[in-house]
Amino acid sequence: MTTTVSRDLNPNFKGDSWYVYGMYNLTGESWGYKGGVFSTPLPNDPGKGMWQLGLRYDTADLNDGSVNFANPAAPVVTGVMGGEESNWTVGVNWYWRSNFKFSANYVMVDSSKYSSTIKDFQDDNPEIFEFRAQLFW
């Protein structure tokens, strides 16, 4: 996805992002498809539930400018330096019943953004574990 923002007093801003992911049903269920929309299958064995394994990569680039470090004490920023980030996510879903799901994700983040406070690029690379229980009808 690419976006361009018109700005009155500065050059236009352009940023982009994209992702790709895949999901595999470990217990052999088939995906439903109706009217151009995929649907989550029901567990083949309601007693054991359905297990899924997923992988995702996403990235965003919100830098549309540059930093001139000719004078390290006072770098000059031109344009927008919104940062860059990419993530790898590995996840597992367990559909305990047809209307109850447990999800767990592990996310590795790689991000970098220019900081005017420290006058340099700052990396932030957390590792995140997410867990969710979901009831739906």
Indicate residue ranges for each PLM-predicted region.
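Outer-membrane beta-barrel pore domains
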Residues: 1-137
